[in-house]
Amino acid sequence: MTEQEDTFSAVRFHKSSGLQNEMRLKETRKPEKARLRVCSVPWQLIVIALGILISLRLVTVAVLMTNIFQYGQQKHELKEFLKHHNNCSIMQSDINLKDELLKNKSIECNLLESLNRDQNILCDKTRTVLDYLQHTGRGVKVYWFCYGMKCYYFVMDRKPWSRCKQSCQNSSLTLLKIDDEDELKFLQLVVPSDSCWIGLSYDNKKKDWAWIDNRPSKLALNTTKYNIRDGGCMFLSKTRLDNNYCDQSFICICGKRLDKFPH
């Protein structure tokens, strides 16, 4: 073999060795790149998944904030509605109460008008009775007035209890029956300074004090303090209600309720 052939063979061998080495190097790098590509794929998926999760959370938070805001607004509107409704209810209650008061006032006015009519009728009839007594010569000094549902007649001619009873009956009246404590206090303010017979006496059959109509009264009397030995008839003065002997002569108090007087 010549020198040129040896040189050519050496060059070819060198080139082929270099090519083989380069081929091996490329083949060695290919799996590494493949591994890198394979390894990079899961990270991309994780990043995408995380992005999706974060986006979903942001959307969820936004929805929650929107709902919270709407709930707060609805709650405020509900409070305003309830407040307005309560105000309307209160106003309606006030209107109903005022209507009821007006209705009661109207009823009271009608009752007062009726009482005034009855009182005027009774006063006219009373004047007729008094005028008749005076014209027949049986008239005596009398003064009278009406208060509430009752009219009072003070016969100033002093008489025993039985004659006072008769004088009242002659005028279609009765000796006064006191209905309650308020009436007693009122009468003590208006009675004359002298003692006045009233329609309360001791009933020997019942062994107790009884009013002229034999009916109970709301006037609470401690009858135990009245000794029958001091008298069996009751009189009224400005300071007290007490008993005395029935033959004593006092002023007479006659009375009559408006609803008992004939129309």
From Swiss-Prot:
Assembly information from the UniProt record: Homodimer; disulfide-linked. Interacts with the adapter protein TYROBP/DAP12; the interaction leads to natural killer cell activation.
The answer on whether this UniProt entry bears the keyword Oxidoreductase reads: no
Query: Which parts form a coiled-coil structure per UniProt?
Result: none
Outcome (variant: residue 189 to F): In strain: NOD and NOR
The protein's location, in the record's own words, is: Cell membrane
- What domain of life does the native source organism fall in? Eukaryota
Keywords from UniProt, A to Z, are: Cell adhesion, Cell membrane, Disulfide bond, Glycoprotein, Lectin, Membrane, Receptor, Signal-anchor, Transmembrane, Transmembrane helix
The alphabetized list of GO BP terms reads: cell adhesion
Annotated glycan sites: 87, 104, 170, 222
Q: What is this protein called?
A: Killer cell lectin-like receptor 4
Q: Which Pfam families match?
A: Lectin_C (PF00059), Ly49 (PF08391)
User: Which residue intervals define the domain C-type lectin in the entry?
Assistant: 139-258
